[in-house]
Amino acid sequence: MPPHLIDGEPHDHAHDRPKRQRTPGEPLRIGIGGPVGSGKTALVAALCKQLREELSLAVLTNDIYTTEDADFLRRHAVLPDERITAVQTGGCPHTAIRDDITANLDAIDDLIAANPPLDLILVESGGDNLTATFSSGLIDVQIFVIDVAGGDKVPRKGGPGVTYSDLLVVNKTDLAPLVGADLGVMERDAAKVRQGRPTALISLTDDPAATPVLAWVREQLAAIAEADRHGAASGIAH
């Protein structure tokens, strides 16, 4: 699908849309954010490969000036091309997922219209820093991905993505010995700042299926399926 464009102008971060009320039967929207190079696109690819035989899903990526992440997913044939689309955000990647989400909403509408019925849409943010989060008007739940390359201090530094995401993923754990990162420290500090919200430590090298993340996604899908059976606006499990 063709890329959707926005102007990328900065906006007041205090303004956000109300939390979206998912209508029964609508696809679950999961946001996947995190810094550049943390492994967001590789995680999206892994989830698509595991879920594509059991669910109807689609992917929306956000890149600053290119469609590189969407192109990567198409090249690796994780889903049919028509189920992958991109938003080009301009110079401020967090704007498109938090402050002015119009282009992302339009792209989601196009995916739903082109691929009915969808069960799940994965929305990948452009690479940003630890302050980037999704608008609650855009997604239902969000995953924030960091990796061990920044050292074991990253969870301790916090930030909205680390602290408040519905699932924190510490990626590339196989590299921890090479960079001197203590996974135990990362897990402990994440638990402290996240106050009960789950954290998953993964290595896509050692576990290409991203098993703990996959299990969490299935839990979210089960929660909305249960809500749909009762005909209520979904309450997503955290």
Swiss-Prot record:
Molecular function via GO: GTP binding; GTPase activity; nickel cation binding
Binding site for GTP: 34-41
Gene3D superfamilies (UniProt xref): P-loop containing nucleotide triphosphate hydrolases
One of the GO BP terms on file: urea catabolic process
InterPro entries with a match to the protein in the record: CobW/HypB/UreG_nucleotide-bd (IPR003495), P-loop_NTPase (IPR027417), UreG (IPR004400)
Location within or outside the cell: Cytoplasm
Domain of life of the native organism: Bacteria
GO (cellular component) term, any one: cytoplasm
Main location: cytoplasm
One Pfam family cited in the UniProt record for this chain: cobW
Alphabetical UniProt keywords: Chaperone, Cytoplasm, GTP-binding, Nickel insertion, Nucleotide-binding
Bias kind Basic and acidic residues: ranges: 1-15
Region feature Disordered, mapped onto this chain: 1-27
Subunit-structure text: Homodimer. UreD, UreF and UreG form a complex that acts as a GTP-hydrolysis-dependent molecular chaperone, activating the urease apoprotein by helping to assemble the nickel containing metallocenter of UreC. The UreE protein probably delivers the nickel.
HAMAP family: UreG (MF_01389)
Described purpose of this protein according to its UniProt entry: Facilitates the functional incorporation of the urease nickel metallocenter. This process requires GTP hydrolysis, probably effectuated by UreG.
Recorded family membership: Belongs to the SIMIBI class G3E GTPase family. UreG subfamily.
Name of the featured protein: Urease accessory protein UreG
Native species: Nocardia farcinica (strain IFM 10152)
